[in-house]
Amino acid sequence: MIREQNPEIFLRNAFKDYYRSWSPDPVDLIHQREIGFIPFMGTMIRHRSVTGMKDLKGFGERTVPRHLYYSTAYYRKPEERIMADKEWMGAELIFDLDADHIKVPGNPRYDQILDVVREHTLRLVERFLLSDIGMDPESILVTFSGGRGYHIHVKSESIYNLNSDSRREITNYIRGEGLDSSSFPRMINDGTGITGIWREEIDREFCKVFTDIESSQNSLLKEALGDGRSVRPYVSRLRKTAAGSSAESKLTIFTRPGHEKYQHLDDQDKLVLAHIISQVREKIMCEIDEPVTTDIHRLIRLPGSLHGKTGLAVTPLNIDELKHYEPLRECRAKIWKDSTVNVFMEAEYVIKFGGEIVNIGKGENEVPLDLGIFLLAQRKAKLV
């Protein structure tokens, strides 16, 4: 039968066991960070501080947090309740990628959702932060959030003093904000505003469309122009000599990499460009939670702590690990690995957990303790 015991008590006791054996991951300048937490009974408590890692361990044991956070900012007086009194000294640059902000088609399993978010995270790190912006790999820390996403911490002297507006410029660039068929040609022609991966990808795709114009006619051009009957006369006009060009057609100019072609766009060309920009944004943009990045006083999950909605550990990983990372295998709390618990399921539930597909049937099931904690925390199950 289903227990009358409150599952919250069961979860708190499990978390208590974890924090008793907890060895916190080292955090630089932890004594200059604000600490916050959400207990099992109550709301967020902020403006705490610790003297070092040993004190942090004791803090976890005493409070048994459902969620444990630390500030991405450094302060002279992190325990002060008024933000101005904390005396801000700088902050890491943070990117939060979460399933709440990323479209995942269909009705995916939890682990499949994590795969999609992981791909966005890897793209952000490799294509934008490293390749495009040129950040030092050693300055980047990636952590699995313990829930449905990843956090990226950038630690660099060139970053710490950036204000919110400067950080917003970075998020706007990564998300491709402000790119449209009017602004892009203008920024290309005057050499301002857009460089790097966006310029390269849009220009490459533009050239490709007009190089493969015959195969493009029945798909992209039709969608862009909004009327299949407009495609043939449009292509015919492209084959004519371009205005301002002594001998070349617009089609020839449009197939050549570089900024020249954007000086010859008419209204229909801009419709095609708008469609190309939309497709490129869909392909390479990264959906990040902008308020997290722009907030220079942000609290974020502490590495090594448990996520209260999953029981999974907030886990640091390197960039190579991110390429094939499986949080539901790698982020399980070792203290629970040899125990089981009986749970009652109102409905069947399928998940890849611990590297294996697990089909949990409706009714009573005996499952590994960490999986049971996950199901209880997700409110997918009840204790029996």
What are these model-derived regions, one by one?
Residues N172-D289, T293-I296:
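Long, charge-rich alpha-helical interaction segments
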Residues Y110-P137:
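Long, well-ordered alpha-helical scaffolding segments within enzyme catalytic domains
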Residues E92-F95, M135-D165, E169:
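Histidine-centered divalent-metal-coordination microenvironment in nucleic-acid enzymes
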Residues E287, T294-H297, P303-V314, E321-L371:
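C-terminal accessory/binding modules appended to enzymatic or scaffolding proteins
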Residues R379-V384:
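A short, conserved structural fragment
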Residues D17-N107, E290, T310-L312:
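SsDNA-processing nucleotidyl-transfer enzymes
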Residues F374-L375:
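Basic amphipathic alpha-helical segments that dock to polyanions
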Residues P78-D85, L129-F144:
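Catalytic micro-motifs at enzyme active sites that drive phosphoryl/nucleotidyl and oxygen chemistry
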